[in-house]
Amino acid sequence: MKISIFSGGRGNKNLFQAFAKEQCEHELNIIVNGLDDGASTGDIRRLMDYKIHGISDFLKTITAFSNDPFIDVMEIRFPKNSNFLEKIKMISTIYQFLEQNITPEFLTNSKTKPTESQLKFIKENLLTFIENVYKFREEIVDLSDYKIGNIIFASLLINNNLDFKVSIKKFCKICNIQSNVNILEAAKLPLNLVGILKNGTLLPNEASVVLSRTTDLIQRTYQINNPLSLNQIRKISSLEKNDKIQYLNALETTTDSNIEVLNSLECSDLIIYGSGTPYSSTLPSLEYLGVADKIASNNCPKILIANLQKETDNFLGTSSLIEDVIKFLTKSSTLKHDPKDLITHILVSNNNEIENKIVFDIQELKIKFPWITIIEDDFNDPNIKGTHNGSKVLDSILNI
């Protein structure tokens, strides 16, 4: 069986771990857009002149499929630098590690201690990363709060001329991912995500789209070629709402979906819209040109995994999420597709004990979307409230 899954970073972790645990032989094609731009991921994008996708969601997806102990090592972060002296101390620590073979305390004192061979591998990739950044930008990287895994992936990109596809495959090999699991770029062109709230507030980057701590809903997101400059942010923020929308409309970019994604959607036996942060993870991947045409022409089940818990006060409800899946898919095509050909099933949880549970009305769903088969069960993970029970979701999907 061939399965295509639209995914972000963390939202489908338990499902992916269930696939790995069961050692399923199905061909899995995981579609990730890489619009993330927060923290060290955003810094790496900047250091590479925004010629690459955000790497964080790709790494989270890949490592979810791996049982290799090195995964825990790659989760280790460099200490946060809160002032100038701590930055100087960090530079000294890195020098001692690279030149004097003195292992930093944050590595030796970590819960998961790297082996000698792992330390050597980390050192090689760290040197490649910071040396190349200095060579081409004359900038010493501030590694505050950087993940080891991010540095390794950035080094792979440098060694492979920023070829994302090749770097993904090599990182998968490092993580010992099964050969039947393919991680695909949703689009080849690296883009940047911005948005606007219904009250007119600008969301100037992907991080603000994800972390919009407000009860006001997101009205629209836009994918643009270059990140907004400070001058652009100031200018847009000073405009009235309609003028803001007009400005962002002019910046918006449309691009083709990755041909590998289109081929996968065309031949899939199951297409899954995974759970996660909708406006940054799943939905943007649906608006790349060609996606809806391939999904609509395939008669396989198309399954939406509804989120269990609100991440923010303005998080989408289940009914709104279905509407947005259809709306974003519509943007990817000049043809008018019947919604029945775009989504056929939805998985919703009937566990009412989840904190900040996303409320839905089964009868409302049946009235608004009568063609959708609703699969209702307790999909909550008993060990981690608010996350999916990966094995139960997997069983439900494979039994459709």
Where are these regions (language model features)?
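Electropositive, gly/pro-rich neighborhoods at or near active sites that engage anionic ligands
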Residues: 33-238
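Conserved catalytic alpha/beta core of Sir2/sirtuin-type deacylases, generalized to analogous enzyme cores
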Residues: 1-4, 10-30, 38-41, 150-272, ...
